[in-house]
Amino acid sequence: MPNYYSTSDLNLASAIIVSWYQLSHIQKDKGKGLFFFEPSHKLAKFTEDYFLWRIRLDPMEYSGSIKTLKNYLYNTP
C-alpha cells in the first residue's frame, strides 16, 4: 500500500475534495473518519495554504462536500 496523506479534519478533507484532489479511501471508526489522499507536492502546498487562510473555494461546493462526507460517515455501515 502506498504512503497516503491522511487527515481526520472533515473541513480540510472537504476543501481538498472541492479543489479536485482525488479521495483514495476513508477509514471509519465510531462515526469519525480518517480521509486518505494520494500524496503530491501540490497537495502539500494546498494543505499549507489552507491553514494559512490562502485558499478560495466556492461556498456551495464546499458546504456540499462537507454534507456528503458527513452523510457517508453517519449513514453507512
Language model regions located:
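N-terminal acidic leader/helix
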Residues: P2-K32
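C-terminal basic regulatory modules in eukaryotic proteins
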Residues: Y5, A44-P77
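Alpha-helical interaction segments
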Residues: N11, H25-Q27, S40-L43, L52
